[in-house]
């Protein structure tokens, strides 16, 4: 098939054939072949959620520390953000804590389950994606 790809600020797009083609990135019309994964890198997972802005820094720190103590993530980043979202038909604007966790493939599903079971929101944001890191960082996250 064909995949439309944006080619810059004009939002013009071109059609790129997909299927049976090596992976690539298209950047302003320049085709860049991605390097194959080698022993120089490893695949990890970033799991992201948010916590209520009403929680103070110590409370958020304790929540994050419990993730580390359970050995489900190697590192947890936390920062304040402002979020705009629709909840129960109303547009809301709220201060929240953005929480980003680095974890391994073997711990990802258990980490997601822990977040679901202990999260203060009825419908928490829980999203995740794989990332490639240096082999040294990969080994550190693996434990």
Question: For each of these PLM feature ranges, what is it?
Answer:
Residues 1-143:
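Positively charged, small/polar-rich N-terminal and surface patches that mediate targeting and assembly
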């Amino acid at each position: 098939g064909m995949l439309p790809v944006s080619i810059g600020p004009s939002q013009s797009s071109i059609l790129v054939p997909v299927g049976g083609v090596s992976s690539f990135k298209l950047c302003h019309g320049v085709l860049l072949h991605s390097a194959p994964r080698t022993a120089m890198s490893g695949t990890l997972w970033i799991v992201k959620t948010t916590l209520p802005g009403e929680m103070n820094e110590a409370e958020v720190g304790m929540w994050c520390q419990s993730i580390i103590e359970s050995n489900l993530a190697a590192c947890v980043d936390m920062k304040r953000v402002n979020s705009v979202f629709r909840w129960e038909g109303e547009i809301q604007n709220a201060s929240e804590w953005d929480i980003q966790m680095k974890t391994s493939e073997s711990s990802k599903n258990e980490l997601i389950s822990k977040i679901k079971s202990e999260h203060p929101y009825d419908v928490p944001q829980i999203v995740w994606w794989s990332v490639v890191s240096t082999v040294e960082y990969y080994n550190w996250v693996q434990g």
